[in-house]
Amino acid sequence: MAATGEALTPQGYIQHHLTNLSVGEGFWTWHIDSLFFSVGLGVLFLWIFRSVGKKATSGVPGKLQCFVEMIVEFVNNSVKESFHGRNALIAPLALTIFVWVFMMNFMDMIPVDWLPHAASLMGIPYLKAVPTTDVNITFSLAIGVFLLIIFYSIKVKGVSGFVKELTLQPFNHKAMIPVNLLLETVTLIAKPISLALRLFGNLYAGELIFILIALMYGTNLLLSTLGVTLQLGWLIFHILVITLQAFIFMMLTIVYLSMAHEDH
């Protein structure tokens, strides 16, 4: 049952699958597996879309080109409906976020023992293949969005406009500046935190459920049969979850950046 080929207790099995391959200690710990899969999937996304773009023709498109065009059109329409400013970066950014996050989420569809077992054959003791079950990855994505929010808020409104937004809303009175600053700062900081924790929480919970279902295998015939049924049912439902979470992350990014472009 263990990915390393050793007999593990149920608690040890769960802990093994939730442990990252890491180097360093404390704050300076690097999760090598999360970095490898997130960067690798990002490169794969760029390669696929670049290849399709170079081979695109005005004639009858192939299946892959149709699929890519459908995604691009869907994201482009989402941006048109939700983003009210003018910025040529937003649509490519939204496309990158949606596809990249979906691809990282989709790694959760691979049976939980396959990749860790393959890694153990190469002498790698731990392997987490779903980058979005690592809070460091989700916070990295969210912080990137947060920095863009700050950048465009200052670029569009100016430093003085940005400061006024933090100090004179929602109560437009000088006496309320401390209260406004506190409320607006909390609201601003809550954006990346909610983005990161929502994605992490949903994918971590989904991964944990797959692991718990996998524990049923090898116990007895009844539980093994039940495990197969549960695995299939959760797999079908989880496809909706991973797609929805990628969509939500993309849409909130678009909305937050649209708010940053509003010049009052």
Swiss-Prot record:
An annotated GO cellular component: proton-transporting ATP synthase complex
CDD domains for the chain: ATP-synt_Fo_a_6 (cd00310)
Any one GO molecular-function label of the UniProt entry: proton-transporting ATP synthase activity, rotational mechanism
Bilayer topology term: Multi-pass membrane protein
Superkingdom: Bacteria
Compartments where found: Cell inner membrane
Keywords linked to the UniProt accession: ATP synthesis, Cell inner membrane, Cell membrane, CF(0), Hydrogen ion transport, Ion transport, Membrane, Transmembrane, Transmembrane helix, Transport
Disulfide bonds: none
InterPro entries: ATP_syn_F0_a_bact/chloroplast, ATP_synth_F0_asu, ATP_synth_F0_asu_AS, F0_ATP_A_sf
Positions of transmembrane segments: 29-49, 90-110, 134-154, 177-197, 208-228, 235-255
A biological process from GO: proton motive force-driven plasma membrane ATP synthesis
Subunit and interaction comment: F-type ATPases have 2 components, CF(1) - the catalytic core - and CF(0) - the membrane proton channel. CF(1) has five subunits: alpha(3), beta(3), gamma(1), delta(1), epsilon(1). CF(0) has three main subunits: a(1), b(2) and c(9-12). The alpha and beta chains form an alternating ring which encloses part of the gamma chain. CF(1) is attached to CF(0) by a central stalk formed by the gamma and epsilon chains, while a peripheral stalk is formed by the delta and b chains.
Function: Key component of the proton channel; it plays a direct role in the translocation of protons across the membrane.
Family: Belongs to the ATPase A chain family.
HAMAP family: ATP_synth_a_bact (MF_01393)
Listed name of the protein: ATP synthase subunit a
Organism: Shewanella baltica (strain OS155 / ATCC BAA-1091)
